[in-house]
Amino acid sequence: PRSTLFPYTTLFRSLDNLVIVKNNSGAIYYPQININNIGDWNYLEGYQMYMTSPDTLFVLGSMVEPENTPITLIQGWHIIPYLRNSEMAIEYALESLENSFLIVKDNSGNIYLPAIGINSIGNMRPGQSYYIYMLYLDTLIYPEN
């Protein structure tokens, strides 16, 4: 489902430092030249944002219950949101996926590659999105808050 409460033009209005937003499919929101082929905010997707300087995005609405919010992921790369309201060790946060993914990356270049015991991400954090490479179809269900 897509949120009809938060079209990009409204959601990002307060972010003067925003340059561009990109989703997993390559669609973009580029306010300076009036391009929005993403549509409305989808809380089941993660996004990449390029800013000229740090800023805070405030979103109003109901809190998501992560344990009741499945995210279906097909084979390949995805940008996933972290739906919990507190940090959690990545191995527990992604436990519902078992062995269906190969690697997870954050926006700082850290990785989680469980097959060879690498975890430089540590905890997943609220407000962050992560790249994940799925080996096959599975459903991500985060533990409850």
Language-model segments: residues:
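Single conserved hydrophobic/aromatic residue that forms the stacking wall/gate
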Residues: P1-T10
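N-terminal exported-region signature
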Residues: T9-N145
